[in-house]
């Protein structure tokens, strides 16, 4: 019984260069490059225009690593080819974002402004005063940067003010009942 996810081959799109040297996997594409160390007990090989992963044995930890390695490598191939992005929406009177160098300055109703500088490989764009786009090749880092920005002023349930993902629905609560 092998890992259902791990046994699926990863298609290599045109324009993506893949290298496997021992346990080191690297992918290079139009959007950038990324590398990953394949866990022990898992071997990766390029067959035609696909990457195939095989597990050394059928033990549960190996099966788990098999599926994990396949998912991470598939994400890397997609990331260097297409890239990943998350859009954040700023809701609230006077709340806005302004591009400042490579970073973004947020005005979120605090007594001070908050400046966010992106890590290496991540770009931040302000499409308008109320929308910020986080882009990069690494899915995990893009999601983490977006989550850190959202955390600056998480949406509150009464008026929905704060920073939310563009596709996120905020569960609203009724205010207190008056007499």
From Swiss-Prot:
GO CC entries: cytosolic large ribosomal subunit
InterPro entries, per the entry: Ribosomal_uL6-like (IPR000702), Ribosomal_uL6-like_a/b-dom_sf (IPR036789), Ribosomal_uL6_a/b-dom (IPR020040), Ribosomal_uL6_bac-type (IPR019906), Ribosomal_uL6_CS (IPR002358)
Coiled coil stretches, renumbered: none
Protein name, per record: Large ribosomal subunit protein uL6
Alphabetical keyword list: Ribonucleoprotein, Ribosomal protein, RNA-binding, rRNA-binding
GO biological process, one term: cytoplasmic translation
A Pfam family assignment: Ribosomal_L6
PROSITE patterns in the cross-refs: RIBOSOMAL_L6_1
HAMAP family listed in its UniProt record: Ribosomal_uL6_B
Known function: This protein binds to the 23S rRNA, and is important in its secondary structure. It is located near the subunit interface in the base of the L7/L12 stalk, and near the tRNA binding site of the peptidyltransferase center.
GO MF annotation terms: rRNA binding; structural constituent of ribosome
Similarity-based family: Belongs to the universal ribosomal protein uL6 family.
Oligomeric form and interacting partners: Part of the 50S ribosomal subunit.
Gene: rplF
């Amino acid at each position: 019984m092998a890992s259902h996810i791990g046994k699926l081959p990863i298609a290599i799109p045109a324009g993506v260069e893949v290298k496997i040297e021992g346990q080191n996997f690297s992918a290079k594409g139009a959007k950038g490059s990324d590398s990953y160390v394949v866990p022990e007990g898992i071997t990766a090989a390029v067959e035609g225009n696909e990457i195939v992963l095989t597990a050394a044995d059928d033990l549960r930890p190996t099966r788990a690593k098999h599926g994990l390695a396949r998912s991470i490598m598939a994400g890397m191939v997609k990331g260097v080819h297409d890239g990943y992005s998350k859009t954040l929406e700023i809701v609230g009177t006077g709340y806005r974002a302004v591009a400042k160098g490579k970073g973004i300055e947020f005005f979120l109703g605090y007594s001070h402004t908050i400046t966010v500088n992106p890590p290496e490989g991540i770009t931040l764009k302000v499409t308008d005063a109320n929308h910020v786009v986080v882009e990069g090749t690494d899915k995990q880092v893009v999601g983490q940067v977006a989550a850190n920005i959202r955390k600056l002023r998480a949406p509150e349930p009464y008026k929905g003010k704060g920073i939310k993902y563009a596709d996120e629905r905020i569960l609203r609560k009724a205010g207190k009942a008056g007499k």
